[in-house]
């Protein structure tokens, strides 16, 4: 088992992402890879909707080190392959999306599905299975309301499951709300955040800076 150097928390607006969390239904503790804001330019003003933290299980460090050890933050930030490897790598990921402005479950889920479908069509992988998975995804969110400080939690398994949980106060619940078995959806949700057209460039920058530094620290301790 790899022993990680000291991992720090990240604050995004008023939201603090702790250095380590244990996802709902998991016996593993994940470390904070990076965090950032998701917003949109509306009438010349940048409106912030959510703060997003991306956590990884410890095995991610060993997996990423093979190709990215010794690379600078700028080198990994500019590489689409780096983020693709986080999305598709053989390790678990946990994403915490905390609302800054109120959002309905329908608003949030429809936008996520729109981004996922656009990604699948771009890579030629939109099948009936993905269509069915998005319908399940929309159903899970249908009656939810996320007030400021509430969180949407995703656990992405390399085996292909997407675990969805909700928290009204930003804490980590013990149990999940739903599990959807579809590898393409599991990966596409994270891809929509940190991928080529990801909705949170600041989370990508944070991941690049923190992980490149972490890989350097791990290299110096081995």
UniProtKB/Swiss-Prot annotation:
Catalysed reactions, semicolon-separated: a chalcone = a flavanone
Pfam annotation, one family: Chalcone
Swiss-Prot/TrEMBL site (Important for catalytic activity) positions: 108
Keywords, in A-Z order: Flavonoid biosynthesis, Isomerase
EC number: 5.5.1.6
Domain of life, source organism: Eukaryota
Chain positions recorded as substrate binding sites: 50, 115, 192
One Gene Ontology molecular-function label: chalcone isomerase activity
Pathway per the UniProt entry: Secondary metabolite biosynthesis; flavonoid biosynthesis
Disulfide bonds: none
Biological processes, Gene Ontology terms: flavonoid biosynthetic process
Signal peptide positions on this chain: none
Keyword Glycoprotein recorded: no
Free-text function comment from the UniProt entry: Catalyzes the intramolecular cyclization of bicyclic chalcones into tricyclic (S)-flavanones. Responsible for the isomerization of 4,2',4',6'-tetrahydroxychalcone (also termed chalcone) into naringenin.
Family stated for the protein in its record: Belongs to the chalcone isomerase family.
Note: Part of the biosynthetic pathway for all classes of flavonoids, a large class of secondary plant metabolites, many of which are brightly colored.
Protein name: Chalcone--flavanone isomerase
């Amino acid at each position: 088992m790899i022993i990680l150097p000291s991992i720090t928390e990240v604050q995004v607006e008023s939201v603090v992402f702790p250095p380590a969390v244990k996802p709902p239904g998991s016996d593993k503790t994940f470390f904070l890879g990076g965090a950032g804001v998701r917003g949109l330019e509306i009438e010349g003003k940048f409106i912030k909707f959510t703060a997003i933290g991306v956590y990884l299980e410890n095995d991610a460090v060993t997996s990423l080190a093979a190709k990215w050890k010794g690379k600078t933050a700028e080198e990994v930030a500019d590489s689409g392959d780096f983020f693709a490897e986080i999305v598709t790598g053989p390790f678990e990921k946990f994403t915490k999306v905390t609302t800054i402005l109120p959002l309905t479950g329908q608003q949030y889920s429809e936008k996520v599905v729109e981004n996922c479908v656009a990604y699948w069509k771009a890579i030629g992988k939109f099948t009936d299975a993905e269509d069915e998975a998005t319908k399940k995804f929309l159903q899970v969110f249908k009656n939810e309301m996320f007030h400021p400080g509430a969180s949407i939690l995703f656990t992405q398994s390399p085996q292909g499951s997407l675990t969805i949980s909700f928290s009204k106060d930003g804490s980590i619940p013990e149990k999940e709300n739903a599990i959807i078995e579809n590898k393409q959806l599991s990966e596409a949700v994270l891809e929509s955040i940190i991928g080529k057209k990801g909705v949170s460039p600041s989370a990508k920058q944070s991941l690049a800076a923190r992980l490149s530094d972490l890989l350097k620290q791990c290299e110096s301790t081995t």
